[in-house]
């Protein structure tokens, strides 16, 4: 499930286990991390802007969404796969976001791009694909712009406002688009048995991709409200200065 809840891309290097390291080296590591993260976020902002322009240009020229995915798929695949670096950033400690949170966010996008839309060509012209592509594109332009300006210590209020308001509409739209796309893929997956492992085989294991997709769709039911309301709490905290008290489970 696409989510933009993490707010940790601040360029701060982790100092866990580095208590005896010279302060000068820690500062250099922090500077290097900040430079790299600034470059990364500028590149990702530019990439999603290119994607947005390509989508608008295609629709203006063709007047239809059919063929849109095919026309932008290389750019989409490159920049979405490039986002795997965000997991690496967490692993090496240059951002304070949880590895699990980053992993879920990035892997859900990779799953939709490579294992659904890329692999099941008959669904590429579905309107639901355009739905999540538009939601992702606006979300990512806003998110990476927010990170870039934050790293540069010059965050325009509009970018901050957009970061914590656009998701109110875009997040549900993206989720609906993803769910409808997976649903559209089900008949093809069931008919072809793609990615499924049948018994008997020498490993004595089985896997049914069709039922895996059903379980994936069902997982949105508990996850979406949890993530959405977390983001709403973050919005109140950042934009309105409310103190949010998290209840212990």
From Swiss-Prot:
Task: Enumerate the subcellular locations listed in this protein's record, separating them with semicolons.
Answer: Endoplasmic reticulum membrane
Q: GO molecular function: any one?
A: protein phosphatase inhibitor activity
**In which pathway is this protein known to take part?**
Lipid metabolism; fatty acid biosynthesis
Residues at the catalytic site: 171, 178
UniProt catalytic activity: a very-long-chain (3R)-3-hydroxyacyl-CoA = a very-long-chain (2E)-enoyl-CoA + H2O; (3R)-hydroxyhexadecanoyl-CoA = (2E)-hexadecenoyl-CoA + H2O; (3R)-hydroxyoctadecanoyl-CoA = (2E)-octadecenoyl-CoA + H2O; (3R)-hydroxyeicosanoyl-CoA = (2E)-eicosenoyl-CoA + H2O
* Entry EC no(s): 4.2.1.134
Q: What is this protein's function? A: Catalyzes the third of the four reactions of the long-chain fatty acids elongation cycle. This endoplasmic reticulum-bound enzymatic process, allows the addition of two carbons to the chain of long- and very long-chain fatty acids/VLCFAs per cycle. This enzyme catalyzes the dehydration of the 3-hydroxyacyl-CoA intermediate into trans-2,3-enoyl-CoA, within each cycle of fatty acid elongation. Thereby, it participates in the production of VLCFAs of different chain lengths that are involved in multiple biological processes as precursors of membrane lipids and lipid mediators.
User: What is this protein identified as?
Assistant: Very-long-chain (3R)-3-hydroxyacyl-CoA dehydratase 1
- Origin species, per record, is Canis lupus familiaris
């Amino acid at each position: 499930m696409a989510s933009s809840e993490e707010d940790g891309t601040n360029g701060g290097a982790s100092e866990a286990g580095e208590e005896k390291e010279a302060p000068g080296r820690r500062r250099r590591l922090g500077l290097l991390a900040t430079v790299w993260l600034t470059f990364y976020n500028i590149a990702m902002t530019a990439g999603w802007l290119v994607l947005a322009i390509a989508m608008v240009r295609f629709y203006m020229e063709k007047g239809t969404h059919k063929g849109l995915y095919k026309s932008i798929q290389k750019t989409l695949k490159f920049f979405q796969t490039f986002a795997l670096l965000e997991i690496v950033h967490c692993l090496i400690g240059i951002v304070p976001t949880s590895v699990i949170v980053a992993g879920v966010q990035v892997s859900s996008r990779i799953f939709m791009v490579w294992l659904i839309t890329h692999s099941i060509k008959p669904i590429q012209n579905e309107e639901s694909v355009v739905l999540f592509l538009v939601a992702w594109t606006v979300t990512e332009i806003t998110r990476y712009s927010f990170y870039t300006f934050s790293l540069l210590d010059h965050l325009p209020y509009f970018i901050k406002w957009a970061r914590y308001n656009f998701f109110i509409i875009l997040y549900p739209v993206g989720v609906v688009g993803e769910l409808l796309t997976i649903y559209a893929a089900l008949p093809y997956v069931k008919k072809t048995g793609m990615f499924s492992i049948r018994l008997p085989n020498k490993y004595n294991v089985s896997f049914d991709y069709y039922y895996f997709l059903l379980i994936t769709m069902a997982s949105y039911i508990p996850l979406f409200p949890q993530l959405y309301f977390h983001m709403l709490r973050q919005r109140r905290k950042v934009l309105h200065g409310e103190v949010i008290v998290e209840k212990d489970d």
